[in-house]
Each structure stands twice: as structure tokens, then as C-alpha cells.
Amino acid sequence: MTEFFQTLGMNYEWAWFTATIAGILLIALPVMLAVAMVIYVDRKVLGAIMLRRGPNVVGPFGLLQSFADGLKVFLQETIIPSAANKGIFLLAPIVTFVVALVAWAVIPFGDGMVLADINVGLLYVLAISSLGVYGIVMAGWASNSKYPFFSAMRAAAQMISYEVSIGFILICVVLWAGTFNLSEIVEAQRGHGLGIVNGYFFNILLFPMWVLFFISCLAETQRAPFDLTEAESELVAGYQTEYSSMSFALFWLGEYANILLLCSLNTVLFFGGWLPPIDWAPLYYVPGFLWFLIKTFLFFFMFSWIWATVPRYRYDQLMRLGWKVFLPMSLLFVFLISGYLMATGHYG
């Protein structure tokens, strides 16, 4: 992109700066539009499962409800508690929002449709996603209130616990694909299952890892049945209790952007990314980014369905599941997959 702006007569510094801003906008604007749509889908799915209609007034079929809510919170007053640490209190939602957007830079939406196609893309996503807990801890501490503080401590313990098992699961994928590059991981899944299925989910060794990864994503994003950081009956609204206006909205945008990010990682790592489900020539006439969007939104639908139907875990059950079930299982499969690859000589 820098070369394109240089052809317009800009020197290298201005071309690089303009290309960087353009790249940020190319990622941020579509992600924000997608977040607005998935919030609408989330509310519609919850309404349907609860035998309600969901949003249906603002715009056709209620499609503009998210934009109306965004305008409402934008016009509201930002209220800061008198005992709060003002600087950190206002910085926390910004950190959560920015971290959720930055990780999208390496996600391939299609063949060549990636902002930064780096060789350590998976490692980058893992590192960036683990920073999201800082915004939550900052919010809980700066609010100077017991409910947000308890929520922040829960969030920190929960995210750290499941990051470990997610790390081992991703090692399994990297061992099989032979690369950290997300685009190359997608290409490695072409015709992987019986020579016709595009995706690692068909692999008898990697399918259990996908199940663990999907459940870990629910815990990582604090979604039901692991939404203990926002347990209304215990913690009011959790770390968001003292927030209002755009500060509250930034937390919501960051939360849903992070959910979409992990849904897209499910697509890229286990379900063939932009590749069609079956390696059949007519299916390749459908643009790759459409396959990517369809798979990602199907995963988001699963998130919403689980949120509406599965009861919340107790906190001790959550910790036990992470440390006594997921961690040993993921570590066991690292050894199993490593042994299989060494025995068969199959790498990448």
C-alpha cells in the first residue's frame, strides 16, 4: 500500500504514514460495522429463544437498533464517581477497545486479504488477546468500588487460567501446519480430511482440540456459561458497574470485537478460513471472504445460543475445569500429536 501512495507523488515518509492510517481504517470500520450487526443478531437470537421479537422498531426489522443505541450513549453524560481514580478510570475502556481492534491486523479474510501477513501471526494474536485483561483490571481497581474490584479479580484469574490451555491447543495446530503464519495455516487445511474436506476439524487428533478451544473462547470472552465477571445476581454489572455513556459503550464494543476475533480464529485454525467446506471446484466460485464471514457468523450464533440456554457455572467449577481438565488434556494432546508427527514424518 505504501508503494501505491508513492506512485501518487508522495515521498516515502508521507506514503508510509498515509498507508498506515488507511490500513487502520480498513480494519477498524468494517469491524465496527460487524460489531453493530452482531449485537443486533445477538439480541434477535436471544429474543427468539425466549419467545420474544427482539429489536423490531428502529429501521426495517430493527436493523438500525444498534446505531440508535450508539447515538444514545454518545449523547449521554459521562459520570465519574467521586472516589474513582479519574485517569485510569477513563483509560481502562480505551485500552480494552484498542486491544480488541489491534489483533485484527493479522486475520486473513481471504486469499491475500490481510493487513499484515507476518510469519508469527498466531503468536501475535495470542500475545495481543492476553492484554485485554489489563483494561478490565484497571476498570475494577480505578472504580474504587467493591463489585467492580471483585469482578476484575475474577476476570484476571479466569483469563489467565484459560490462556494456558489455549496456548497448548494452538501449539497442536502449529505442529500440524508447520507454521505460525495464519494464511499458511489456512492453506495447510486444503483437502485435509479424506482429500476433500477443508479444515482440521475433520482430524481425529485435532477435533478434540477444537472442542477445548471453543469452550476456552467462551471463558476467555466471559460469555455464558462463564460470565462470572458480570454475574448480575452477585456483582450487579461487574467491572462496568460505575461506567456510563461512551466509556460503557467502549467496553461493549471491545467485548464484541474480541468475541468476533475468537470466532474468526475458530474459522482460520480449524475450519479452513476462506476455503469452502469441501474441496469441490464449483464452490470456489463463491468469493473466499464470503465463506470466511459465513463460518465466523455461524460461530457467533453458537455463542449466542449457548448464552441463552446454558446455566452459569460456579466460580470453583470454572477454575476446576480450566486447571484440572483442559490443561492436562491439552498438554496430553501436545505429546500425542508430537509423537504422531515424529512417527509418521509428517510436518506441515
From Swiss-Prot:
It is found in: Cell inner membrane. InterPro entries: NADH_UbQ_OxRdtase_su1/FPO (IPR001694), NADH_UbQ_OxRdtase_su1_CS (IPR018086). The keyword Ubl conjugation does not apply. PROSITE patterns: COMPLEX1_ND1_2 (PS00668). It catalyses: a quinone + NADH + 5 H(+)(in) = a quinol + NAD(+) + 4 H(+)(out). Keywords: Cell inner membrane, Cell membrane, Membrane, NAD, Quinone, Translocase, Transmembrane, Transmembrane helix, Ubiquinone. GO terms for cellular component: plasma membrane. One of its GO terms (biological process) is aerobic respiration. It is an enzyme of class 7 (translocase). It is a multi-pass membrane protein. It comes from the Bacteria. The keyword Membrane applies. Its EC number is 7.1.1.-. NDH-1 shuttles electrons from NADH, via FMN and iron-sulfur (Fe-S) centers, to quinones in the respiratory chain. The immediate electron acceptor for the enzyme in this species is believed to be ubiquinone. Couples the redox reaction to proton translocation (for every two electrons transferred, four hydrogen ions are translocated across the cytoplasmic membrane), and thus conserves the redox energy in a proton gradient. This subunit may bind ubiquinone. NDH-1 is composed of 14 different subunits. Subunits NuoA, H, J, K, L, M, N constitute the membrane sector of the complex. This is NADH-quinone oxidoreductase subunit H.
